[in-house]
Amino acid sequence: MTVRTRFAPSPTGFLHVGGVRTALFSWLYAKHHNGQFILRIEDTDRERSTQESVQAILDGMAWLGLNFDEGPYYQTERYARYQQVAQQLLKEGKAYRCQCSKERLEALREAQLAAKEKPRYDGHCRNQILPDSGVPYVIRFRNPDAGIVSFHDEVYGDIHVDNSELDDLILVRSDGHPTYNFAVVIDDWDMKITHVIRGDDHINNTPRQINLFKALDAPVPVFAHLPMILGEDGKRLSKRHGAVSVLQFKELGVLPHALLNYLVRLGWSHGDQEIFSVQEMINSFDLKNVSRGVSSFNYDKLYWLNQHYQKSDSQESVANALQWHFEQAGIDLNQGPDLKDLVAVQAERCKSLAEMCQISQYFYTDTIEYNEDAVKKHLRPVVLEPLMVLHERLKALDEWKNDKIQECINDVSLQFDLNLGKIAQPLRVAVTGSGTSPSIDMTLALLGKNKSIKRLEDALEKIRARASAV
């Protein structure tokens, strides 16, 4: 048997982290078993489905590297198939036409609620022969009257549901459009899906779908339902918890494999291992180690993993990902150091690529914004003479290398009997505008000689103006 899994999102909004984890687990299971992973777009909600959401799903999957072997298939392109199967079920007596009005169904529901009963269809049209006479009707499934629906969920174990708890669900609405529970069964059957891995909000649908599979004499897939992901406050993950769309994590500067590594550990474990390459995930993944407990999304843990990969990945690969952030900021990368060199000095100092871009823009701009507190603290008249001497020493350098730059700084600090920081910090503020940067020698080396000298001269003018104002 070839394992075939699927990811079947609805294009009614963004691709959220819960959906991404479902896609990841389905993808990993297929890859682990040398199977196939199918992408299906469940776009039957015509009012809420948008092409923008479809594109966001495709872009998110591509960014994460979750390549699919087949698809994307679209449910809206399969309506003829759903109608064909519905007519087959009608012909075999496994479905029936129902002409109950909305008013009757609403009255039935209110009466059942008043009697503290579970709202369900009462089978009013079940045994009537209703021809297609032009009166609007829906097509309902003739659910078995008795018996138990039993299945083994790979996460939750054995589940048993009495058929008396299930009513005759609608397969096709009066406008001819299929319902979710009907379309998904036909799709999984036609696409030969062997394992359905999805959120546990679908557990209640599973007994109904199993009855449909059996009515069609179709093989019933294996089911695995994944627990929900919550925010750290124990509530359902939403916008108030921060980013929820997968592409928002790209904007936040999270590396795609860092996000995958984080998500795979939300509800799945392999011993005590925390760090997984994508290949290690594929090699190790199974469903028996998926937890039934809900998971909490922790941004600190995600950023810890992200920083790990910023430091351990090749500088070239991190630089390639970082380039997108500079482009979004409108920064001309031709005006500064090679991004690989920037990554070498900044990767350990930042939790994300977005932060790395934000704190490194002074390397690529002609002008800088000064932090006024840093200027007030470090660009004081007392450092005017040492910085003037340092300016001349740096200007005279033939080789603009970090070791030569550091020699100049050391010599001037000795000449004026100053602690090294008393020279380095004013110099840092002079060339970056703030009191934080990589080591001062590397900062100047990456800035280049012309930019460093020009900014030091501008800072000296600031200090002179401040001294004359005293």
UniProtKB/Swiss-Prot annotation:
PROSITE patterns: AA_TRNA_LIGASE_I (PS00178). Catalyzes the attachment of glutamate to tRNA(Glu) in a two-step reaction: glutamate is first activated by ATP to form Glu-AMP and then transferred to the acceptor end of tRNA(Glu). Belongs to the class-I aminoacyl-tRNA synthetase family. Glutamate--tRNA ligase type 1 subfamily. The lineage of its organism: Bacteria, Pseudomonadati, Pseudomonadota, Gammaproteobacteria, Legionellales. PANTHER family: GLUTAMATE--TRNA LIGASE (PTHR43311), GLUTAMATE--TRNA LIGASE, MITOCHONDRIAL-RELATED (PTHR43311:SF2). It comes from the Bacteria. This is Glutamate--tRNA ligase. InterPro entries: aa-tRNA-synth_I_cd-bd, aa-tRNA-synth_I_codon-bd_sub2, aa-tRNA-synth_I_CS, aa_tRNA-synth_I_cd-bd_sf, Glu-tRNA-ligase_bac/mito, Glu/Gln-tRNA-synth, Glu/Gln-tRNA-synth_Ib_cat-dom, GluQ/Sye. Gene3D superfamilies: 1.10.10.350, HUPs. One of its GO terms (cellular component) is cytosol. ATP binds at residue 239. Keywords: Aminoacyl-tRNA synthetase, ATP-binding, Cytoplasm, Ligase, Nucleotide-binding, Protein biosynthesis. Its EC number is 6.1.1.17. Monomer. It comes from Legionella pneumophila (strain Paris). A motif ('HIGH' region) lies at residues 9-19. It is found in: Cytoplasm. One of its GO terms (biological process) is glutamyl-tRNA aminoacylation. HAMAP family: Glu_tRNA_synth_type1. A motif ('KMSKS' region) lies at residues 236-240.
